[in-house]
Amino acid sequence: MANVTVIVGTQWGNEGKGRIAHQVSKECIAVRGTGSSKAGHTVMIGGQKFTLHLLPAAIVLPNTQCIIGPGVAIDLSILATEIKTLQAMGVKVSPERLIISPRAHIILPYHISMDKMHEKLKGSNKL
């Protein structure tokens, strides 16, 4: 039977899930199940710094397969930039290594405009 490791954050993000996932994902299938590009994580390998927002941190490891799941909201321009940046750094990002769920959500420009408008309307009642 295969080993399964699940990393769950309970602090509204920014608690180090990406770093922990990277440490346990040397040869595995890494899944990003939820979230968007607003948060990010940075991993260091051999003195090289990788900053990621949408892709699982394990994408920088050569023997992993990565999945972006149905609960992820994807800004396509950010994803494309992230992939191009990693490829320029020598990371192989290909359809064989990166699977994107057809049920993942796509962030469109009007979503960003609506989000900005809603935040402005909240005024001092923000969280």
Regions found by a protein language model. Give the residues of each.
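Non-transmembrane, aqueous-exposed alpha-helical and coiled segments at domain scale
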Residues: 1-127
